[in-house]
Structure formats: C-alpha cells, structure tokens
Amino acid sequence: MRRRFGVKMASMDWLLDLYQRHFDWRDLTLVMLSPVFGIFIAMEAWRFRKTGVFDLWDSFDSMNSGGSYLVTDLILLVVLVLPAMGWVYDHRLFTVEVTPLRFVGLFLFVEFLYYGFHRGSHRIRWFWCAHVVHHGSEKMNFGTALRQSWFYPIAGNWLFYLPAVWLGFEPRWVLFALSLNLGYQFFVHTTWVDRMPAWFEFVFNTPSHHRVHHGRNPRQIDTNFGGTLIIWDRLFGSFVAERDAGKIRYGVTMRQPRSLNPLHLVFGECVSMWRDLWHHKDLRILWKHPDWVGERYPDRAMPEPLPDRAP
C-alpha cells in the first residue's frame, strides 16, 4: 500500500514541478473574478426567478462546465500552453517591456486576435468542436458565460495569440490581457440590460450585440464576434444590430445538447465530427464550416438524435 502510494506521489512530481516553475498570479485572473461572477448570477437569478430566464438543469450544465474548465485550463496551461508559447517567445522578433500604455496596445491587439479566434471557431469545424459548448444553452443569462469547454487548449485556441508573443510580448502578459477580455465578456451574457448609450453601442460589445451572436436563426448566425469591442465586426462585415436580427432563439442549429453528461456536452460534437470524417472520407470536414458536411452530402448527412434532458 505504501509503495503504491509512493509511486502515485512520484508520478505527480513532474506536475508540481511545472507549477512551481510556471505559476504566476496572472494565471488566476478568472478564478479571482469568480466571486464577482457568482454575485451577479445570484442577483440575476433572483431578479428573473419567475420569468423562465433561468432553468435549473441548464444552469447546472453551465456551472459544471465552468468549474471543470477552470481546473483543466490551469493544468493544460502549465503542461501545454505556456511551454509552447515560451518556445515562440524564445524566437521572438523584439523584446517589448510592458508599460501601462503598451499594455493598452497589447490589449487592443489581443482583442483583434480574439476576433480572429472567435470567427474561426464558428467557421472551422475543428475549432467549433470546442466552442459549441458555449453555444449549447437555449437560455441567455450570466450563467451561460461560464459554459466553456475543456477542449479549448487541446483544440489549439491559444495558437491565435502566438503573433503577440512572436512580436515580443511575454506570454503571461498576453494571457492576462486575454483573461481581462474574457472577464468583460461575462457581463454581456444577459437580457437584464436592454441597450447602452449609442456611443458605447457603436464601439463596445454589449448585451444587445451578444444576444444576436448567441441566436440560431439565419440572420443571427456567424455575427458579432468581438470580445470587448464591436469595431472589428463593423469593419469586416459581420455586425448585425439587434433591431435588424429578428426574433432571437438561443442555441445551435444542429445537434442541440439534451444531455447532462459532462463528457457528452464537451465531446459530443467531436464524436460527430470524427463520425462524419469516417463516414465520408473527406478531410475537408476538419476545416470547413460546421454546416458544410450537410450541404456537401445532403443525401447522407443525418443529424443524430440526442437523449432528452433529465427532468
């Protein structure tokens, strides 16, 4: 028994060593913001307790996904993401010392890179396999913001931010800017706020803009990808105002999750993608739009039924 316990402890030494060498307070930005998120979720749930904005099982899905995401993301950060970013940083073009003004510039650059990541996550099926978890809820509330996938680091979402590291920004500052970006985005997942002042709506991502992004009707799909800013959508033609979007129904168009099984929520779309790949023998499925396989093989594409949500 002692020997077995010793072997198990020894097998964890490499992970503890990685944490000791890589750990930094910036890694815990979203963890430190979690109490704030919890307060706002509780306030919103109480405010809309009789309106159907919150659903018990849907909220359970979101909280479960969010908590497990934070844990797995921290592990994969030190095991995979930071070592890879560190290698790129060792081959950087310049060395950029971070000052307050330069950090503002970095934040704006990371926001631009986030737009690329977010747009790619909707239009490339490989990345959609991770991002679909966030869009699986048919509700729009603060809890939905926490609905994230363990699969993100494995799918390679961090690859989109390597240009900032290659230019000379230390990886942790890049990830810190991204964490602040994601922290802001928590507050746009709500129906509590109607519209912000016109100047704010023109520049920043807002609840109004993001409600459109989470819609599944034709006018709402693949729109409003910005994280903190909406200017990239205006520049690149992906912006749709809520007043022009029609009635919004939340969720996804195909394979809407109906299971409480966390493994199904996280990996269900991955299984579907690999099944399509095996069935059609077409590698383009990996990088084409998630709907492409149904358009390319309409006679053979059959959305698979999913189990009903637990009562």
Regions flagged by a language model, labelled:
Residues 41-60:
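Membrane-interface helix-loop junction between the first two transmembrane segments
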Residues 35-46, 81-85, 107-113:
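Central hydrophobic cores of alpha-helical transmembrane segments in multi-pass inner-membrane proteins
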Residues 67-79, 92, 96-249:
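Membrane-embedded catalytic scaffold of the fatty acid hydroxylase/desaturase
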Residues 20-37, 57-73:
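Alpha-helical transmembrane segments in multi-pass membrane proteins
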Residues 15-18, 84-95:
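Membrane-interface helix termini and inter-helical loops of multi-pass transporters
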Residues 2-27:
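Short, strongly hydrophobic alpha-helical membrane anchors
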Residues 4, 245-311:
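Cytosolic-facing loops and C-terminal tails of multi-pass membrane proteins
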Residues 9-13, 34, 38, 69-83, ...:
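Alpha-helical membrane-anchoring segments
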